[in-house]
Every structure is written in C-alpha cells, then in structure tokens.
C-alpha cells in the first residue's frame, strides 16, 4: 500500500471527524493525530517490493503442479483472476499457496476437468485499474469461462470515492458477463482486523471498507455477478488467529489466510459453473454480528488443509 494512500485515508478521516465536531481546534488536532497514525501504520507494515509467485498454467484433476500453458495444451475451463495484490497472492511463499491456484486445483478436482489459470491481477491495483486488466484480457484472447475479482482495500486506503469504485467494479463485471464469463467477486476485506493500523484510524478505514463492500455487492449483483462478502465471512477468523492468518508484513494474508478465503469462494464459483456437488450453497450473509465485534480473546486452532474436511470453524472462545 503506497505511503500516499495512508496519508489520503488519514486526511479524509480527519476531515470527516472534524466536520462532525464543528470545532477548528479539534479539526487541526484530529488531522495531526491521524496523519501521525498513518505514518506509524506505514512504518510498521512497511513496503514490499516482492512479486507474488507465478502460478499460471493448466491444472489437471488430482495434479499438484500445472502443465505450462502453450497454445497446443488442451483445457476444458478457463479461470481468470483480476484485482489487487490479494488476488495475485502477495504474501505467499510458493505458487501452491496462491488463491488462484487453490481455486484452479479445487475446481479441477470438483469438476473433473482441466482448468487453465490466467492471472491479470496487479499488486497495488484499485478498482480504477480493473478496466485495464479486462482490456489486457481481450488483447490476449477471448474471455474466460469464469473470472474471480478481489479488489477494494487499496480503494479504501487511497480514499477513492466509494460510489465510483463500486461503479468501476460493476462495469468490469458487466464486460466480463457480456463475454459469457461467470463472475465471482470477493468484496472488500475488513481492514479493522489489521492490528498494525492504530486507532482511531483503524475504525475510519474499517467503516469505509464495510461501506465499500456493501456497494460492491450491489454493483456486482446488478451486473450479473456473484458477490462473496469476505469481510463478514473472514473477520471472526482473522480476529481470532492473526499470527496464523496474516503474512509477515502484517497486512496481506498468509497461506492459511488465502486458504480460508478460497474455502468461501470455491462453492460459489463451482456452483455458478454448474460443477458443484457439495450440496446447497448457502446464501452469503448480508451482515455478520461477529464481524461487528472488535477484539477477541480466543484459542488458536490447528491449520487445516484445503477442502478435505469441514470448513474452518468460527471464532473460538469469548469475544470482548
């Protein structure tokens, strides 16, 4: 996340809080305080220039590694990943941990078909960049059978217009749907689970993130896509086990965090393609009581592998 993004979030947050207070002195104090917190958050989280592992290829049922993609390599389904660094898998140590790979492998096993994975996601991207990613797709070839979009966190920290961000996402979904692709969108995650962001800045970005997620879900549905509310589904787990679910930078998910997200994305993706045999896919929550709660007092459970058993449980222990 660029330094200017944190400064933009702090500045906008100070403006909003000060407007509510109606006091000039409070405005300056709030601005100074939140700007200092933005600098602190950027210093703790740091900058990463690492590239996510490259994971594209054709995944066969039961195979651990892909067949490198060439024009003469056959496949049955084409899965394409769009969005930001979480879509690209920043924080993963190996290609096998990347969310696109988790989904491609699981979809190949579920459908018993050969799944080609192509990644257009770019670290640091906001919803503004989705149009360019879709353009790049059309330059490379025809639309895929399925697309997964993960985007939103950078829109929040850069304090882009939530309405415009949702519109841009909806436009990307519409273009992909017009090309015949099934589209699944993981909406903006809950930035309130990032402990490196100090209070009250954390509350500011958390509130914006949840507002953006709701707008993204509405725009996705209107364009014919399938939204998956990651904030509502993942917040309890990330609050209960941050050391396990965050990567070393404290901001991006770890392999276990991406695995947890893939558990929630796969049933929606496979069902939309007509290849889900795991029973009825429940309607995703519009809101979650657990996601509104703040600091957990929990026990940590063991890491589970992807999809062989029941989904990772909800928060263990008491939440204060």
Feature map (PLM): residue ranges:
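Residue-level recognition of beta-strand->loop/alpha-helix junctions
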Residues: 119-121, 187, 229-232
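A short helix->loop->beta-strand "cap" motif at the edges of active sites that frequently abuts
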Residues: 179-181
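Conserved SGNH/GDSL esterase-like catalytic core that processes O-acyl groups on lipids
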Residues: 78-80, 88-167, 308-317
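Alpha/beta-hydrolase-fold catalytic nucleophile elbow
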Residues: 150, 186-187
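N-terminal secretory targeting modules
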Residues: 1-78, 274-320
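Alpha-helical scaffolding segments of alpha/beta enzyme cores, especially the outer helices
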Residues: 167, 171-175, 211-218
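Catalytic His-Asp segment of secreted/periplasmic serine-dependent ester chemistry enzymes
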Residues: 192-320
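Short helix-capping segments at alpha-helix termini
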Residues: 108-113, 177, 222-224
């Amino acid at each position: 996340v660029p330094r200017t993004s944190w400064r933009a979030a702090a500045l906008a947050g100070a403006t909003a809080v000060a407007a509510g207070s109606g006091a000039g002195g409070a405005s300056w104090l709030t601005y100074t305080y939140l700007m200092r917190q933005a600098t602190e958050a950027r210093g703790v989280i740091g900058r990463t220039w690492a590239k996510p592992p490259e994971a594209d290829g054709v995944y066969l049922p039961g195979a651990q590694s892909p067949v490198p993609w060439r024009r003469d390599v056959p496949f049955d389904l084409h899965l394409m990943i769009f969005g930001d660094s979480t879509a690209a898998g920043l924080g993963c140590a190996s290609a096998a941990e990347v969310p696109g790979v988790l989904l491609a492998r699981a979809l190949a096993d579920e459908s018993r078909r050969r799944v080609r994975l192509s990644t257009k996601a770019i670290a640091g991207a906001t919803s503004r960049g989705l149009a360019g990613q879709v353009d790049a797709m059309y330059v490379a070839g025809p639309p895929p059978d399925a697309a997964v979009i993960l985007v939103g966190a950078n829109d929040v920290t850069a304090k882009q217009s939530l309405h415009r961000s949702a519109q841009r996402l909806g436009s990307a979904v519409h273009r992909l749907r017009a090309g015949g692709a099934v589209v699944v969108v993981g909406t903006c995650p809950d930035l309130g689970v990032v402990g490196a962001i100090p209070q009250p800045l954390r509350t500011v970005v958390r509130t914006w993130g949840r507002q953006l997620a709701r707008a993204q879900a509405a725009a996705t549905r209107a364009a014919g896509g399938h939204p998956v509310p990651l904030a509502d589904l993942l917040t309890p787990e990330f609050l209960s086990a941050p050391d396990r679910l965050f990567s070393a930078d404290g901001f991006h998910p770890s392999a276990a965090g991406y695995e947890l997200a893939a558990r929630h994305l796969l049933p929606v993706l496979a069902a939309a393609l007509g290849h889900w045999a795991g029973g009825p896919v429940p309607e995703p929550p519009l809101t979650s009581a657990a996601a509104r709660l703040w600091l957990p007092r929990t026990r940590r459970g063991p890491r589970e592998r992807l999809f062989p058993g029941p989904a990772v449980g909800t928060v263990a222990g008491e939440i204060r």
